[in-house]
A protein has these predicted regions:
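Conserved short strand/loop->alpha-helix "switch" segment adjacent to the catalytic nucleotide/phosphoryl-transfer site
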Residues: 31-57
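Short, well-structured hydrophobic secondary-structure segments
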Residues: 55-65
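Conserved beta-strand-loop-beta-strand hairpin that lines the nucleotide-binding pocket
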Residues: 1-21, 64-158
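A short beta-loop-alpha structural element at the N-terminal edge
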Residues: 25-30
Length: 158
């Protein structure tokens, strides 16, 4: 009887997880295809839809631009409880996040501002993962009007 209760709990937990995967050719159409897939999750993503769409677009674009591999790009979007997890994997060699934040574009700075946490795993491939809270963080307290970005990202005169 106890095993039935555990099985029921596992089934309920799986029902609470909404997951989609996509395999993409590493070409200029990949970011648009990734955005199209995320668009199908609009109701599940709630108020974070635009943020997730932007992060997925940035990560897939980076994968297309910076991985020299012709192997497919893999994307995962997983919605579970109060969190959204994104993963974009390619056969590239990876990168050091701290050294990549000041590069040619703003993509990783945007990811850093939206994400609750993010990082890179390398093990024969490169996976950039991002965790986003399902509910947007609201600014509170007396300093909420202040720019909270790290000093290295502030604009001159800001």
């Amino acid at each position: 009887m106890a095993s039935m209760a555990v099985l029921g709990s596992l089934i309920r937990r799986q029902a609470d997880v909404n997951e989609t995967r996509l395999v993409l050719k590493p070409d200029d159409r990949a970011p648009a295809k990734a955005r199209d897939r995320v668009s199908g999750l609009r109701s599940s993503l709630g108020p974070r839809f635009d943020d997730v769409l932007l992060v997925v677009s940035e990560l897939v674009t980076n994968s297309v631009r910076h991985s020299s591999s012709t192997k497919p790009i893999k994307m995962l979007v997983q919605i579970s409880g109060s969190r959204i997890r994104l993963e974009v994997s390619d056969r590239g060699s990876g990168f050091e996040p701290l050294h990549s934040m000041g590069g040619g574009g703003l993509g990783l700075m945007i990811v850093d501002r939206i994400a609750a946490s993010w990082g890179v795993h390398t093990n024969g491939s490169c996976t950039v993962w991002v965790e986003i809270s399902k509910l947007p963080q609201m600014a509170t307290g007396p300093d909420s009007s202040q720019d909270q970005s790290p000093a290295r990202f502030r604009q001159p005169g800001g």
